[in-house]
Amino acid sequence: MVWQRQHVLGLADFTPEEYQMVLQTSASFQEVLTRRLPKVPTLQGKVVVTLFFEPSTRTRTSFELAAKRLSADVLNFSPGTSSLSKGETLLDTARTFLAMGSDLLIVRHAQAGVPQQLAAEIDRRGSPVGVLNAGDGLHEHPTQGLLDLFTLCSHLDPRRPRLELLQGIKIAIVGDILHSRVARSDIYALVAAGAEVHLAGPPTLLPKDFAQFVPGHTLPIHWQLEPALEGARFVITLRLQQERMGEFLLPSLQEYHHFFGLTRQRLRLCHPEVRVLHPGPVNRGVELSSEVMEDPGLNLIEQQVTHGVAVRMALLYLMGGGRIPA
């Protein structure tokens, strides 16, 4: 198998073969991360630039660590202290990094479509530089979708995570789906895997047209939590994106928790071996109760963080010209 994508901008058009390449390569790097010296020279001499125009701790740190574990040189761009504050355009800033000899650009922006604009400019120039979307507006967060997919598959078969493991498995995605780019990427990945995906949330945060989010596929929509949880093997709960909400979308955080917060009692409706995921940061007592948060036998949140490094290593490696491990 040969990786063909120059840019990873979203999962809407990912093929099953591409998902499998990412899962297989991520598993190899997950093993690397358990070694006494968790570093390989595969991207030595490559320059990786993180262009984060939106606050981020987890994603930025995960990408930076992934690049350094691959021995790449990492440049962190800070918009507040850059020429952007002096009137330079985003494209001009990107052109500067291209002229410096960058190999990969990791882009996070509050506006949907910015990574696509940069990728289009790179393609227009005929440059081999790759763009990796680290989250753009309400569009997508592909690396979170891929790490969630890897976490689920690895939980079911740690030695050989693969797409078909999720075939027919009921997975509930709960919460602020309207404002969640994570939900969008997760939906694409899980539907591609053949999972039975259910969406649950308040009507103001889960429009009914999400049922047709994936062309040719109808997703069950639940405005009450219990039907979505019944028999679910996994539950992915989402952070309430209060910074993106209008003031009338939720009566209060307490009311949200009352109707949609995950508690140990509610999780009894699920499969006996249910596991909970959350992209972080978690609002304790809102999306998840503390008892669920503190039970490592119930949630996979720490595994998501660990797997995030391996998955981002895999993508950087593949986009940087690496070969698929046998």
From Swiss-Prot:
Cellular component terms per the entry's GO annotation: cytosol
Positions with a binding annotation for carbamoyl phosphate: 58-59, 108, 141, 144, 280-281
Broad class of enzyme this protein falls into: transferase
InterPro entries: Asp/Orn_carbamoyltranf_P-bd, Asp/Orn_carbamoylTrfase, Asp/Orn_carbamoylTrfase_sf, Asp_carbamoyltransf, Asp_carbamoyltransf_Asp/Orn-bd
GO biological-process terms attached to the record: 'de novo' pyrimidine nucleobase biosynthetic process; 'de novo' UMP biosynthetic process; amino acid metabolic process
Any one GO MF annotation of this record: amino acid binding
Residues that bind L-aspartate: 86, 181, 239
Gene3D superfamilies, A to Z: Aspartate/ornithine carbamoyltransferase (3.40.50.1370)
Keyword Transferase: yes
Record-stated family: Belongs to the aspartate/ornithine carbamoyltransferase superfamily. ATCase family.
Name of the molecule in the record: Aspartate carbamoyltransferase catalytic subunit
Source organism phylogeny: Bacteria, Bacillati, Cyanobacteriota, Cyanophyceae, Synechococcales
Originating gene: pyrB
